[in-house]
């Protein structure tokens, strides 16, 4: 089963954007509410079955991480609409792969040896080049005009800070992984409720498109739980690197199944960028 747990996160997180993009007549509000509500229900069921111990400090910090995740996910969903899944995912994933290791080095003392620092910073450089390549837009693509692309990339950079914070908080926590996951889904639920309340979009909670978007939430939750189990069976480095293959599935899936168009030059740059992103991820985690 450890190999199932190893590859399930990449499959689930890779298919998640494709499921969201396939829901007709859905807005960002439908998508984020459906995703989060389904994730919370899944997390609550797992919590009820396994009954892990949980302290208030663990719960509150996990919830904070979940709230930060919502910031990143909203930015990603907006980007799907603006520039497409096939361009959003490599950029978003690359930014997270750059940010999370840097937080680990600065806040948690990771990459303690000179060799680890050397490979780590080379990996970050490779990741940056990969992100730049995947953001290349040639004429005839479906990503929109240049100003639209630049503004969307800026949005991704800013909202990816939410992802980075969400991924970094659990490193400071010591507790059952299922408890942390449930706390995160609760924080996600509260954050999304506040988001829809402030933007006066509470009506989306009962719309059909919101329910249909719940499929993405189930995929996210299953992948997240499988990732926790994969870390236990395969180690954090191997589990993390393999999970990042989700970017390949979502990017190629956007091109093949969602019919997002790129010219030959744009496609070459995208594939080259994907290879560099995966290579950079390996350098920053396996060495």
Swiss-Prot record:
Coiled coil: none
Keywords: Cell membrane, Membrane, Sugar transport, Transmembrane, Transmembrane helix, Transport
CC per GO annotation: plasma membrane
Pfam (any one): Sugar_transport
Location in or out of the cell: Cell membrane
Disulfide bridge map: none
CDD domains reported for this sequence: GRP (cd23110)
One Gene Ontology term of the molecular function aspect: carbohydrate transmembrane transporter activity
Membrane-spanning residues: 4-23, 28-50, 56-78, 91-108, 118-137, 150-169, 179-198, 211-230, 240-259, 266-285
Topology term for the membrane: Multi-pass membrane protein
Family the entry assigns: Belongs to the GRP transporter (TC 2.A.7.5) family.
Protein name: Putative sugar uptake protein LJ_0170
């Amino acid at each position: 089963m450890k190999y199932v747990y190893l590859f399930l996160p990449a499959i689930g997180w890779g298919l998640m954007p494709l499921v969201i993009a396939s829901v007709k007549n859905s807005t960002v509000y439908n998508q984020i509410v459906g995703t989060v509500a389904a994730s919370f229900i899944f997390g609550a069921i797992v919590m009820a079955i396994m009954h892990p111990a949980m302290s208030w400090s663990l719960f509150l910090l996990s919830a904070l991480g979940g709230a930060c995740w919502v910031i990143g996910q909203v930015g990603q969903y907006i980007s799907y609409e603006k520039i497409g899944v096939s361009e959003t995912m490599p950029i978003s994933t690359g930014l997270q792969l750059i940010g999370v290791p840097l937080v680990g080095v600065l806040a948690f003392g990771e990459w303690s040896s000179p060799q680890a620092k050397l490979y780590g910073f080379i990996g970050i450089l490779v990741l940056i080049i990969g992100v730049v390549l995947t953001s290349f837009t040639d004429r005839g693509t479906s990503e929109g005009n240049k100003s639209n692309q630049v503004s969307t990339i800026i949005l991704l950079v800013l909202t990816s800070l939410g992802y980075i914070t969400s991924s970094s908080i659990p490193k400071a926590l010591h507790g059952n992984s299922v408890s942390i996951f449930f706390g995160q889904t609760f924080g996600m639920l509260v954050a999304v409720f506040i988001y829809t309340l402030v933007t006066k979009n509470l009506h989306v909670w009962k719309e059909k498109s919101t329910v249909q978007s719940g499929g993405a939430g189930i995929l996210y939750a299953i992948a997240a739980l499988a990732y926790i189990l994969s870390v236990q069976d395969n180690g954090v480095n191997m589990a993390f690197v393999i999970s990042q293959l989700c970017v390949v599935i979502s990017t190629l899936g956007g091109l093949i199944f969602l019919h997002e168009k790129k010219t030959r030059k744009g496609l070459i740059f995208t594939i080259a960028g994907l290879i560099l992103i995966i290579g950079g991820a390996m350098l920053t985690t396996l060495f």
